[in-house]
Amino acid sequence: MLSGEAEQLRLKHLVHCRRHKCFARDSGEFCYFELPEDHIEGPAHGVRLTAQGELARSLIREFTQRPLLVERDRGPCVLTVICNCPNLGLHQDLCCHLCAEYNKYRN
């Protein structure tokens, strides 16, 4: 499958997705892949998202004698959803499952 087709399905997911955070809306590298029969998980196909890391900062003021700064650094994350059905191709529900996993990661 061409990267253009995967991009079209990503945009199609974006139209109907109602999640607070959506992989199709945020920046990240989205791709479709196929695994050959001789691969340990093959034959299979699926989608992969490489999400950028994020740095969150907050200030603790309660129960302390002085304000404390807390930083949480989440590095880059690779999320992969693999399907082993005999019908090769990017199924729309793969994008929905990838988005659900993306929300687990981001929350």
UniProtKB/Swiss-Prot annotation:
Pfam families from the UniProt entry: Adeno_E3A
Record's keyword terms, sorted:
Early protein
Q: Which domain of life is it from?
A: Viruses
Give the function comment from the record: Not yet known.
Family stated for the protein in its record? Belongs to the adenoviridae E3A-2 family.
This one is known as: Early E3A 12.5 kDa protein
Q: Which organism is it from?
A: Human adenovirus C serotype 5
